[in-house]
Amino acid sequence: SSCIGFQPENRNINFQSSGDNSNMWVFSALISAATFTSTAVYADDHGSKGMNVPKIGSMVVMSGLENPWDMAFTADGSMFYTEKCKGLSVKTASGKVNALYGMKDSKGYASAGNDLFCSGQAGMLGVVLDPNFKKNNTIYVYSTSSKYHGSGCKTNFEKCDGNIVMKFKVNKDLSKVSGRTDIVKDIQYKPFESNQPFGGPGAHNGGRMAFGPEGYLWVGTGDRHRGVCPQDNSLVCGVVLRIDADGKGHPKNKIKADKRFYTYGHRNVQGIDFRPTDGQVFTAEHGPWHNDEITALVNGGNGGWDPHEKRAGRGACPDQYCGYEPNQMEGMTPAVRAAYTPMSDTRFDDLMFPAWQNNGYSQGTGSAAFLTGKNWGIYENRLATGIMGIGFGGTPGGMRIDIVDLSEDGQSVKSVIHMPVGVSKRFRGLEMGPDNALYATTDEGEIYKISAQ
């Protein structure tokens, strides 16, 4: 492998928004190395020399995978991972790979779910271990399923229960899973293509999961390209769930329409993690043609996404969904689009204002993970966010990992820098390992280990 060390040029650009809820974003553009299999580069946080800036290196630990989506680690370093259209596997601490639970028609798995399938953005997505995994060997998996379609799913304009959360027991040698129990059965799914950009079936499923400090399971979902979803609390779409191990809502969740809901009004939640210093939960979320977001969640709060047609001065939209309007595929100033269908609409009194908005761009925020461990130096307890890179009409593509220094109140950011990992990939999933390294899945089929020292 190749290795390079250097001091990057550091450029600071300040962005100041106007209005009562203005935030300041400081963006430090780092020129990083070219693509290497393994790198060791140095980052300088907005001119701060001598402030414990770590040396960051990356290396490939798995390759040749098919759309690896998420990871979960045991204390000894065994890594469970999902491949969107194949299934759940584990790489044990000894390096052996066991294929545990496959999708319909997948080959080589110890067992499979014939109801599980993939289509477009949908498939086997999030995976997380029970906080007491060492004692109960329980694992949770988010996947698309045909099991609960019932009489629905005949059009894009009706209830379609097509995403689920499954609970399994893993045997002691991590060679198979058993005892599948579906604890959430009614997360919404888009069954057919629509007249939208990226309009195929299976759009906007969310799928990221995490256990919070209280031991409850948090589940992010998406709007599935249905205009009514984010603001209609009778449907499980565009919401974040806070549930127990059996799928029941936390008793202090404030949304009365469905006691499983912690927040609503989301577009497509891709990252969920909890700040180590205070337990505050943050989400990373895909924007439309503008404004990817990082948001501190508030119990009962509204993400502010409302793509319904004939609202806020809008007329009719294709397939009753204004999420890509106006001017679907042509270049347009992000501010113009944002005024038409805002990612965080200020007309909602219960709006949760985002801390970060990606300078007005939509580049595909993936997962997010707080960096933990003294080895991360000045970056410890900052939020790492994967950017998958979606560019059109002159919009910069992205494909990077950002390190976001959030304010104490979670309402703004102090700085954002590009983590100098030395590779440009579609970073889909981020997860901290027990060795205090950051692990990242890529749509190109790899899992990276990113170390700091």
Where do the PLM segments sit?
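Asp-box/WD-like beta-propeller blade repeats and closely related beta-sheet repeat scaffolds
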Residues: 154-210
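Conserved beta-propeller blade signature
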Residues: 78-82, 136-142, 216-220, 280-284, ...
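Surface loop/turn motifs at the tips and blade-to-blade linkers of beta-strand repeat domains
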Residues: 60-66, 101-102, 117-119, 184-186, ...
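Blade-level signature of beta-propeller repeat domains, shared across WD40, Kelch, NHL, RCC1
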Residues: 429-453
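Residue-level detector of Asp-centered blade-edge/turn motifs that repeat once per structural unit
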Residues: 74-76, 129-135, 211-214, 276-278, ...
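Beta-propeller domain segments
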Residues: 45-51, 108-118, 122-124, 132-134, ...
